[in-house]
Amino acid sequence: MRLVILDDYALASEWAAKYICNCIIQFNPGPDKYFTLGLPTGSTPLGCYKKLIEYHKSGDLSFKYVKTFNMDEYVGLPRDHPESYHSYMWNNFFKHIDIDPNNAHILDGNASDLQAECEDFERKIKEAGGIELFVGGIGPDGHIAFNEPGSSLVSRTRLKTLAMDTILANAKYFDGDLSKVPTMALTVGVGTVMDAKEVMILITGAHKAFALYKAIEEGVNHMWTVSAFQQHPRTIFVCDEDATLELRVKTVKYFKGLMHVHNRLVDPLLSMKKN
């Protein structure tokens, strides 16, 4: 497990974007070999998406041979609703890059058969060869995707009831009106993300500090679903200083001492430009 600690949100976002960029380029995707990327929503990845858009617009990165699978989607919210995760992904990322819309997979929270929709999503991931890199964020209660506290750590894509903490946290996107916030969602399972060849989790802000502590300094616990990734062979937690406030001093010192190693993963930033 790697813990990459950057000074602030902007630097953490840039490091994560550089890492994604280098992973895609080193994979050398093509028409017969697509790179599969798992993606989150929420406020945390926005900075990372902005940097990836920059790399695309500068000609350093193409998403032509990338397939994406998003973590989750609300149930019952129209696809074109401004707060649906379809809208979020297209407005904040997809419409700014060269991805084929057919290769951007997002769960359909309005499907007539939600169970079949979840099973189909798992099948599509398998047919794509599995996820190369799954990027995620977490909530203050340590949930990843919508795998709320108490979720099975071997769970698959399924319908979930949202915890009140999550509904309250999401109310800001719905004019503070709890009655407008969806109470159900489709989400990949912890096991779905664990199956990825590599997982990168973005954690920023002091309000996520206790969750980061639970994620890496205590044992695996289904009440803090992000802790499951202690057992993944290739997990990277990318955080800012504020997110480390609950960690032991020696933990922070140990991982900061490895930054020269971590920075080799993103420096130099690779490019798809032809020389």
Curated annotation (Swiss-Prot):
Keyword DNA damage: no
Any one biological process term the GO annotation gives: carbohydrate metabolic process
Role noted for this protein: Catalyzes the reversible conversion of alpha-D-glucosamine 6-phosphate (GlcN-6P) into beta-D-fructose 6-phosphate (Fru-6P) and ammonium ion, a regulatory reaction step in de novo uridine diphosphate-N-acetyl-alpha-D-glucosamine (UDP-GlcNAc) biosynthesis via hexosamine pathway.
Subunit structure: Homohexamer.
First-level EC class: hydrolase
Main location: cytoplasm
Family designation: Belongs to the glucosamine/galactosamine-6-phosphate isomerase family.
A molecular function GO annotation: identical protein binding
GO CC entries: cytoplasm
E.C. no: 3.5.99.6
Keywords: Carbohydrate metabolism, Coiled coil, Cytoplasm, Hydrolase
Name of the protein in question: Glucosamine-6-phosphate deaminase 2
SUPFAM superfamilies per record: NagB/RpiA/CoA transferase-like (SSF100950)
HAMAP family according to UniProt: GlcN6P_deamin (MF_01241)
Catalytic residues in the record: 72, 141, 143, 148
Residue runs in coiled coils: 102-131
Species assigned in the record: Xenopus laevis
Keyword Nucleotide-binding part of the UniProt annotation: no
Subcellular localization, as worded in the UniProt entry: Cytoplasm
Catalysis performed (reactions): alpha-D-glucosamine 6-phosphate + H2O = beta-D-fructose 6-phosphate + NH4(+)
CDD domains listed in its UniProt record: GlcN6P_deaminase
PROSITE patterns cross-referenced by the UniProt entry: GLC_GALNAC_ISOMERASE
